[in-house]
UniProtKB/Swiss-Prot annotation:
This is Flagellar regulator flk. Its main location: membrane. Acts as a regulator of flagellar gene expression by modulating the protein level of the anti sigma factor FlgM upon sensing ring completion or hook elongation. Flk could inhibit FlgM secretion by acting as a braking system for the flagellar-associated type III secretion (T3S) system. Plays a role in hindering to flip the flagellar T3S specificity switch from the rod and hook-type substrates to filament-type substrates prior to hook-basal body (HBB) completion possibly by preventing interaction of FliK with FlhB. Keywords: Cell inner membrane, Cell membrane, Membrane, Transmembrane, Transmembrane helix. GO terms for biological process: regulation of gene expression. Residues 1-35 are annotated as: Disordered. The gene is flk. Residues 331 are periplasmic. It is a single-pass membrane protein. It comes from the Bacteria. Residues 19-35 have a biased composition (Polar residues).
């Protein structure tokens, strides 16, 4: 433990201080000096896992004191400087841990991890992420938060019609299990949704070319399930392959047409899932997002024509005349 405010310092037997040589430098620490050291030590221990006894032993070692030598007034400047340096290092380490935790949230989204790796390699060489300075980490975090970092498109592998490998199937199974736990939706129902979206019939094997699309769909649904008010922008951040201009325009139009909302509006969970499904079908099947006509109005173009004719009697007269003429000719 750190030396107490009163009494002999640790390691000094009672009465030993009375035999110290005279002189200011050989006097025990003053109360003010001890208080200053204790304050610094408290700050260091609050930011690190070090115990006071361990920290105190390290300080004595660094300033060249043997285990049984008392800390004197002349040792105070070196001890204070040592603690100040330890505090500075602890503050930097604590700041770096906080920034790494914030970065971790972004690295899970889309292709951000590859973007950060490329940025570090280009600007900081081969330095690992956890060895960057707080200033460097802050720069990367700010670029991600402000959307100024270039996010590369994920590498596209050649599509194949082979069925999923066991490892690929197990990977999907694990993602389905996580999604079921997060949403409460039965795993069987999630699998059924995946098959229907992919156009795979019951009993057929899922082709491997759908693997990456299904992984993205499952991971996006997992992330969206944790958002109370998802938006098209937050949906886009869940994607490994960001929306291109045509996809963004198509989905924005779909949201406006079906839900009467803008691209910046908050969505319900069901709406966000519907939009994600539309994007999946566009990427897998090339089907543009569309609003299905209601079943009670299967012939909307014809109904619109009849409604227009109802407001123009002359068209009805002409139509009746044409019908009568056709009947007369047939007879």
């Amino acid at each position: 433990m750190i030396q107490p405010i009163s009494g002999p310092p640790p390691g000094q037997p009672p009465g030993q201080g009375d035999n110290l040589p005279s002189g200011t430098g050989n006097q025990p620490l003053s109360s003010q000096q001890r208080t200053s050291l204790e304050s610094l030590m408290t700050k260091v221990t609050s930011l690190t896992q070090q115990q006071r006894a361990e920290l105190w032993a390290g300080i004595r070692h660094d300033i060249g004191l043997s285990g049984d030598s008392p800390l004197l007034s002349r040792h105070f400047p070196a001890a204070e400087h040592n603690l100040a340096q330890r505090l500075l290092a602890a503050q930097k380490s604590h700041s770096a841990r906080q920034l790494l935790a914030q970065l971790g949230e972004y690295l899970r989204l889309g292709n951000n991890r590859q973007a950060v790796t490329d940025y570090i390699r280009h600007n900081f060489g081969q330095t690992p992420l956890n060895q960057l300075s707080p200033e460097q980490l802050k720069t990367i975090l700010t670029l991600l938060q402000e959307g100024k970092m270039v996010i590369p498109q994920p590498q596209q592998r050649e599509a194949t019609d082979r069925p999923l490998l066991p490892a690929e199937h197990n990977a999907l199974k694990q993602l389905v299990t996580k999604l079921a736990a997060a949403t409460g939706e039965p795993s069987k129902q999630i699998w059924q949704s995946m098959l229907e979206l992919s156009g795979v019939k019951d009993g057929e094997l899922i082709p491997a070319k759908l693997f990456n699309h299904l992984v993205t769909w499952l991971q996006a649904r997992q992330t969206l399930s944790q958002q109370n008010t998802p938006t098209l922008e937050s949906l886009q951040m869940t994607l490994k392959q960001p929306l291109d201009a045509s996809e963004l325009a198509a989905l924005s139009a779909y949201i406006q047409q079906k839900y009467g909302l803008s691209a910046q509006s908050s969505l319900s969970s069901a709406q966000a899932e519907d939009i994600l499904n539309q994007l999946y079908q566009r990427r897998v099947k090339g089907i543009d997002p569309r609003v299905m006509q209601p079943l009670l109005n299967p012939f909307p173009p014809m109904m619109d024509t009849l409604q227009n004719m109802a407001t123009r009697p002359a068209l009805w007269i002409l139509l009746v005349a044409i019908i009568l003429m056709l009947v007369w000719l047939v007879r």
